[in-house]
């Protein structure tokens, strides 16, 4: 669908005044330090190299945009233009360390305008400002004692999920099921919604949001971007209904002040004694639900893919998980101690995250002029770090395309080289939460089934996460009792 709009947008660009291009780049792209700008090109006026950046992902090779330019310019920093902004790509562990270490000093988080349009704030603040506020609210729900409580909740939901979606099926589509699993957990943990029909009503528009949040920003009927904007409003309206009902339930003593993040938001004031409005809370819950299931659903899907392709790896995971399963009494839930025993399984999951990182990279914005590696970076430039620049680098990970969980034994990879969750102050606060979801999923799927891929050479597309083009259909072989 996105490729259909490439010629449409290109025709539009032909009518954009070139004077804007020269004004924009002459005023914002020049070096003021005497040092040269990084090597590279800025592509077409206004749209820059955005189509090349996005289309390599649509074709299943997101790393190609990065590695082609690294080879061409022989530099770990190169200039480009993405989403209408002058930009520089920072590639490699040293670059990651520099960006992550200078958060809120030389650089700050930045999202394309499309993100703010899909997630408009009721308070007219940016997605970046909302994210900062959200990080202040999350620690109580992501600290170890809280995470320990979630293991049993995730185990219960996983049992229901596999019973309804996998058992007594000859074939299943893994990616939609993985999204259902992680979204079900997010709904339960964040807003105490767990009834399957309610979860399904929220999940459908969320799928449209995920497909359009980082897309060609054409707000016309039928485009992914337009669908994402409409779906965001639908979800927000549904959340407003949930929030209003919770306020009533709290007032009548029918809900607990500590049962989930929603209750906490309703009852917690800021440093000035001001409470969040219902609209504020809906905005934040919307962002949490997106972040709380997308990363893990992609990871769970690729766990199934790689275990189907690598029977020796499957056997290692199966052995570890069955030892845990056999130690449990009938009906006994998984607990924190069980999770800590899943060492090989987590090494496997980490290797999956290395080869198919859900977070392909992220943007920063230069807060001031600065220099790096002999190049000038002007204030306002957007800076993109890429997970694949280290994950698939043979100098960091020998034989980078080989699946090898032993890379994560002992001390593991060098610092700043394995970055599926980002790094520094902006490292995903839900990293440990996602780890629990993934490991609970692995426990349930391998103790029930072996499987094989229905489409051996199924294409992978990245938009913005890696996704099997056909949803990863697999043929199930239940274990004999």
Curated annotation (Swiss-Prot):
<keyword id="KW-0812">Transmembrane</keyword>
<keyword id="KW-0503">Monooxygenase</keyword>
<dbReference type="Pfam" id="PF00067">
    <property type="entry name" value="p450"/>
</dbReference>
<feature type="transmembrane region" description="Helical">
    <location>
        <begin position="4"/>
        <end position="24"/>
    </location>
</feature>
<protein>
    <recommendedName>
        <fullName>Beta-amyrin 28-monooxygenase</fullName>
        <ecNumber>1.14.14.126</ecNumber>
    </recommendedName>
</protein>
<dbReference type="InterPro" id="IPR001128">
    <property type="entry name" value="Cyt_P450"/>
</dbReference>
<dbReference type="InterPro" id="IPR036396">
    <property type="entry name" value="Cyt_P450_sf"/>
</dbReference>
<dbReference type="GO" id="GO:0016134">
    <property type="term" value="P:saponin metabolic process"/>
</dbReference>
<dbReference type="GO" id="GO:0016125">
    <property type="term" value="P:sterol metabolic process"/>
</dbReference>
<dbReference type="GO" id="GO:0020037">
    <property type="term" value="F:heme binding"/>
</dbReference>
<dbReference type="InterPro" id="IPR017972">
    <property type="entry name" value="Cyt_P450_CS"/>
</dbReference>
<keyword id="KW-0560">Oxidoreductase</keyword>
<dbReference type="GO" id="GO:0102373">
    <property type="term" value="F:beta-amyrin 28-monooxygenase activity"/>
</dbReference>
<feature type="binding site" description="axial binding residue">
    <location>
        <position position="428"/>
    </location>
    <ligand>
        <name>heme</name>
    </ligand>
</feature>
<dbReference type="GO" id="GO:0016712">
    <property type="term" value="F:oxidoreductase activity, acting on paired donors, with incorporation or reduction of molecular oxygen, reduced flavin or flavoprotein as one donor, and incorporation of one atom of oxygen"/>
</dbReference>
<dbReference type="InterPro" id="IPR002401">
    <property type="entry name" value="Cyt_P450_E_grp-I"/>
</dbReference>
<keyword id="KW-0472">Membrane</keyword>
<keyword id="KW-1133">Transmembrane helix</keyword>
<dbReference type="GO" id="GO:0005506">
    <property type="term" value="F:iron ion binding"/>
</dbReference>
<keyword id="KW-0408">Iron</keyword>
<keyword id="KW-0349">Heme</keyword>
<comment type="similarity">
    <text>Belongs to the cytochrome P450 family.</text>
</comment>
<dbReference type="GO" id="GO:0016020">
    <property type="term" value="C:membrane"/>
</dbReference>
<keyword id="KW-0479">Metal-binding</keyword>
